[in-house]
């Protein structure tokens, strides 16, 4: 009898142990203050002339946009993860208009050169991924003061356009 009571007590304690680990909460994790402008973007780089006419598809790449550690609503990071020009710097944003720009900013921590970003926009739901599903899109123009390609190949700056990465293999 003692054996059965011990087994029942052990089973009861184990069941309490499993339910004690079950945390239920109505707490929402939330997001950042600029959540709609942040993301991983699959982009195409275009060579454009001073009038904004596309002269050539230059290359494809990846761009990341993300918030600052202080969760600022006036600036965000833009980073190409070394897929083209190896830049990572802060751009000024207008979150309500979903626009961004930067005037003469060091584009990396080493101070290799300066970048200028103009006409930056995040367009919510305006893009389509490769499967035709709607997604957010990004567009901006950028130039680098240490870039010899524009003079060498006869264009003025780059236009970068793309869509938010869906997380699926495209």
List each language-model region with its residue ranges.
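Positively charged n-region of N-terminal signal peptides that target proteins for export
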Residues: 1-4
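Bacterial signal peptide processing site
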Residues: 22-25
